[in-house]
Amino acid sequence: MDLPENWIVRHSRTYNKDYYYNTVTNESRWDAPVLKGELERVRASHLLIKSRESRRPSSWREEHITRSKEEALKILTDFQHKIESGQETLSALATNYSDCTSAKRGGDLGYFERGQMQKPFEEATFALQVGELSKPVWTDSGVHLILRTA
């Protein structure tokens, strides 16, 4: 992989994964810096569980969502354990349980660039390695599990 000038790959012992470091500015980041002229974009799938505190507490599955944020997080963490243990896939769970309309695509959001998603969602997605599953991520929409796919 070609990196812009002054960028190198280092390994984090704490997180046991590679990251990118700029030897001039001392900036470090999980996502690869892009060469000039390239757009920085990722592809991800997600599973969204909304609560009554969500900015739009309704979905294709439920007209009026009444669960609390705590209940939404419990549902999502149960799904997270099923995915991490290999019992389920994010795609299958998203298809059946996600409160996002992307459920009909197994949670696939397609490619997106910085500035197109809510900031916490964007930051979490760009910090993931391809194939890596996030921990629960809160946005105004609800709580998400995110799988970076490209």
Swiss-Prot record:
Q: Where is the PpiC domain?
A: 39-150
Gene Ontology terms for molecular function: chromatin-protein adaptor activity; peptidyl-prolyl cis-trans isomerase activity; RNA polymerase II complex binding
Which residues does the UniProt record annotate as the domain WW? Answer: 1-35
Could you say which EC number(s) this protein's record lists?
5.2.1.8
Q: Does the keyword Isomerase apply?
A: yes
Instruction: One Pfam family, please name it.
Output: WW
Give the UniProt keywords, A-Z.
Isomerase, Nucleus, Rotamase
Q: Which InterPro entries match?
A: PPIase_dom_sf, PPIase_Pin1, PPIase_PpiC, WW_dom, WW_dom_sf
Q: Which Gene Ontology CC terms are recorded?
A: cytosol; nucleus
- Is Nucleus a UniProt keyword of this protein? yes
Q: Spell out the reaction equation it catalyses.
A: [protein]-peptidylproline (omega=180) = [protein]-peptidylproline (omega=0)
GO biological processes: co-transcriptional mRNA 3'-end processing, cleavage and polyadenylation pathway; negative regulation of transcription by RNA polymerase II; negative regulation of ubiquitin-dependent protein catabolic process; positive regulation of rDNA heterochromatin formation; positive regulation of RNA polymerase II transcription preinitiation complex assembly; termination of RNA polymerase II transcription
- Compartments, as annotated in UniProt: Nucleus
Q: Please state which protein family the record places this protein in.
A: Belongs to the PpiC/parvulin rotamase family.
This molecule's function is given as: PPIases accelerate the folding of proteins. It catalyzes the cis-trans isomerization of proline imidic peptide bonds in oligopeptides. Catalyzes pSer/Thr-Pro cis/trans isomerizations.
Q: What is this protein called?
A: Peptidyl-prolyl cis-trans isomerase pin1
Q: Which organism is it from?
A: Rhizopus delemar (strain RA 99-880 / ATCC MYA-4621 / FGSC 9543 / NRRL 43880)
Lineage of the species this protein comes from: Eukaryota, Fungi, Fungi incertae sedis, Mucoromycota, Mucoromycotina
